[in-house]
Amino acid sequence: MRIAELTALLHLASPALPIGAFSYSQGLEAAIEAQFITDADTACAWIRSGLSNVLAHGELPFLAHQIERWRTHDAAALIEGNREFLASRESAELRRETEQMGWSLRQLCASLEWGDAARRATLASMAPIAQPTAFAFAAIAHDAATDAALAAYAFSWVENQAAAALKAVPLGQLAGQRIIVALREPIDAAVRQALSTSPDDINTFAPQLGILSARHESQYSRLFRS
């Protein structure tokens, strides 16, 4: 991997990227309220399940196919894929999350003039835009390999989930680092699963997550927006 590609992906995966990821827990806070998560071990198991059963079969393969569509600049397929991903969000919170983060990342891409003008015009035409669609654009703008881009996206998700667990369970810093270390190999497996998934086989079925996310909307005390 080229150094420029590596640093670009580190940038996109960084918690310092100003797209608001820190304000979302993607149902983890509701899982704590429901006592599915009570300590470091149950937090790790929850995040592992989300990575292996939700991201690997849904969000990551969608991202992989959007990357290839950006690579060939198939605007019609990009727009349709973006619509399908938005339609797959199972609660208002999850829908607003991907729209807000997608919008913020698109604004960043435009402000930094990433990519060529034609692709930026296609990016600007999508409203609302899902975060994976915007992330796929940013990856292509830096000529990143698809597998490396998926690994960066998955690691960013795991890191954000661990950070949310630290605040909401709460856990110590070392426990959070153990979660991240424990999930490095599952990230590799999730990426390989995603790369082998055709568009017709993408699966976003996660009823427990959808129910918890809907319950989170009226949860009495919350730190996170999802």
Swiss-Prot record:
Keyword hit for Transcription: no
GO MF term (any one): nickel cation binding
GO cellular component terms, A-Z: cytoplasm
Keywords from the named record: Chaperone, Cytoplasm, Nickel insertion
Cellular localization per UniProt: Cytoplasm
Major localization class: cytoplasm
Alphabetized InterPro entries for the sequence: UreF (IPR002639), UreF_sf (IPR038277)
Family, similarity comment: Belongs to the UreF family.
Function: Required for maturation of urease via the functional incorporation of the urease nickel metallocenter.
Subunit field text: UreD, UreF and UreG form a complex that acts as a GTP-hydrolysis-dependent molecular chaperone, activating the urease apoprotein by helping to assemble the nickel containing metallocenter of UreC. The UreE protein probably delivers the nickel.
Name of the molecule in the record: Urease accessory protein UreF
The organism of origin for this protein: Paraburkholderia phymatum (strain DSM 17167 / CIP 108236 / LMG 21445 / STM815)
